Amino acid sequence: MIKALFNKNTALAAVTILALSGGAMAESAKTHKTDMAKKKVSELTCEDFNGLEESFKPTVVGWVVGFNKKGKEEDAVIDVDGIETVTPAIIEACKQEPKASFWKKAEAELKKVF
């Protein structure tokens, strides 16, 4: 298996590139995503996550799941069922507290599933 070679900042860059590669967006959405691109993953808020397109949120959660595994080679798999289970919980937790740390909310929900 491939060892995880990315750090949290690399993950953020990849997530941001994917988020910004979508079609035309409203100017405020562009500004929001541009601001998000300047943040480290640990600095993202639930509000940042809430601003993403719904269809992209599972991708972001997938990155979080991967990095939460702490780079262990034996854990370097994509758990689609787990991601599908935890994504709605993270979305709901972030709706409840938009100013909260996205990373901390995601970690709390991941502990319940993984």
UniProtKB/Swiss-Prot annotation:
It comes from the Bacteria. Keywords: Chaperone, Disulfide bond, Periplasm, Signal. GO terms for biological process: cellular stress response to acidic pH. Gene3D superfamilies: HNS-dependent expression A. Disulfide bonds join 46-94. It is found in: Periplasm. SUPFAM superfamilies: Protein HNS-dependent expression A, HdeA. Coiled coil: none annotated. Its main location: periplasm. Pfam families: HdeA. Transmembrane segments: none annotated. GO terms for cellular component: outer membrane-bounded periplasmic space. The keyword Kinase does not apply. Residues 1-26 form the signal peptide. HAMAP family: HdeA. Belongs to the HdeA family. Required for optimal acid stress protection. Exhibits a chaperone-like activity only at low pH by suppressing non-specifically the aggregation of denaturated periplasmic proteins. This is Probable acid stress chaperone HdeA. It comes from Brucella suis biovar 1 (strain 1330).
